[in-house]
Amino acid sequence: KKILAAGLTAVMAMSLMVGCGSKKDDSSSKTYNLGIIQFAEHGSLDNCRKGFLKGLESEGIKEGENLKITYKNSQADTATDNQIASNFASKKLDMICAIATPSAQSAYNATKDSDIPVVYTAVTSPKAAGFVDKEGKNVGNITGTSDLVLADKQLKLIRQMMPKAKNVGIFY
């Protein structure tokens, strides 16, 4: 599920980055400047970052070729998150990838008055974080994927698909 979320985030990022290039006809000469803010070192968050970058690479955007990455980890400190996000915003990066809710909130707040797109992943409730309106539509310059596990809906689907199942397990 985390890898799928990271992959979907990368696809969204790719579509945003296409619009971030210069006005040149040859977009292959563009080098994108990407800032990545990760809230903490954690296996699932690390996988989100790796999946995001792998998704970009599958679309031809690769570090060292046409992508410059500035990666920062706030070590679970929201004040550090805010500083990183402000720094990224002042550098006018092409895009910010924010991993986990606190990092996404910091990036969103730092870029509200700019056109820097923010793509988040590992955000449990985009609505509660203020990234979508009451209809579920993105607000401002931010989009991404949620890591919310809807176990009740998953179990309902399993029951529909396998009504005779007696033992069901969900890996998370």
Predicted feature residues:
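Short hydrophobic alpha-helices and adjacent helix-cap/hinge residues
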Residues: 4-8, 21-172
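C-terminal motif of bacterial Sec signal peptides marking the signal peptidase cleavage site
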Residues: 15-19
